[in-house]
């Protein structure tokens, strides 16, 4: 599955990014599966689950016992000026650690479902899609690279934020910082499993669409098309939609918590920025730039998560559009026409969408709504604490 989709520079970097995510997840204990090269399947390993549980519990314990921000002058200055900010920050710290714990526990709990889903993706790749040319699927490579780059950016942003805010670099500080970065990396890699799986589903749907276009072109020039070919594409499309639905149900709580955490961090970051720059009358300096870069990277990562799901959903909608092209072709074989009709009816009743927790679909519309809602929460927070600002 991780073989390069071509011999170009971009494809090699894509393969390297996928392997880096795989090996990094193994090392940090968030991918508790062993690969059996003989059967080409993943097997859940209880030893890897235990290793991941102990390792990440140790990270959380080290973060709690080695707080990197406990006595920073900036933090004390902001909290002395505004007591509500201190209370909100304490609640956010508890929420962040709880989110990390729940994400990891749910990933281990759902590891059996993850194993079956990833094995089915591997089975589709090996049995049906491995012989197709993938060099034209540029969006697949692009979004894999974007996702890998976003993980690196989030990690660098955390390092810049912590190092830029701390006045002294003690051994306790570096232990806490290292544990915090490793815990963040484990969370980001765990969340990236969903997005990378969605990108693979997108690539396979893109192949189905390309094959449908080839069939349309063949029929347009009078060549014969077998109905079995159309039935196979419908079968593959049906399995891909089932996989998309299963991925959404497995990772729904994790992804909701990650997206909400990004938005909460941005709301609180802007709120603390207002206290620091306006209430404390601080001029533009390096610390303000550190705040801003963290906000920008968080928002970019949040929007990338939305755009990956939007890409897959948009490609699924294109399938219905391609099937309409068969209406312009005359004298279609009756059996083939029935297969085309079945495919069109299936697309009219089911679509490739990612529904989280029964609440919302992940797409551009939802992304804009969540961004606007977070802005309204910021306004509410400012109005509530107006006299202290």
Curated annotation (Swiss-Prot):
It comes from the Eukaryota. Keywords: Cell membrane, Glycoprotein, Membrane, Receptor, Transducer, Transmembrane, Transmembrane helix. It is found in: Cell membrane. GO terms for cellular component: axon; dendrite; membrane; neuronal cell body; plasma membrane. It is a multi-pass membrane protein. One of its GO terms (biological process) is sensory perception of taste. GO terms for molecular function: ligand-gated monoatomic ion channel activity; taste receptor activity. The chain crosses the membrane at residues 15-35, 47-67, 143-163, 171-191, 255-275, 288-308, 367-387. Taste bristles on the labial palp, labral and cibarial sense organs, chemosensory bristles on the leg and anterior wing margin. In larvae, is expressed in neurons of the terminal external chemosensory organ and in the dorsal pharyngeal sense organ. Neurons expressing Gr22e also express Gr66a and correspond to taste neurons that mediate sensitivity to bitter compounds. Residues 36-46, 164-170, 276-287, 388-389 are extracellular. Residues 1-14, 68-142, 192-254, 309-366 are cytoplasmic. Glycans are attached at residues 168, 281. Belongs to the insect chemoreceptor superfamily. Gustatory receptor (GR) family. Gr22e subfamily. Gustatory receptor which mediates acceptance or avoidance behavior, depending on its substrates. Seems to be involved in the sensing of bitter taste since it is expressed in neurons that mediate sensitivity to bitter compounds which are also avoidance-type taste neurons. This is Gustatory receptor for bitter taste 22e.
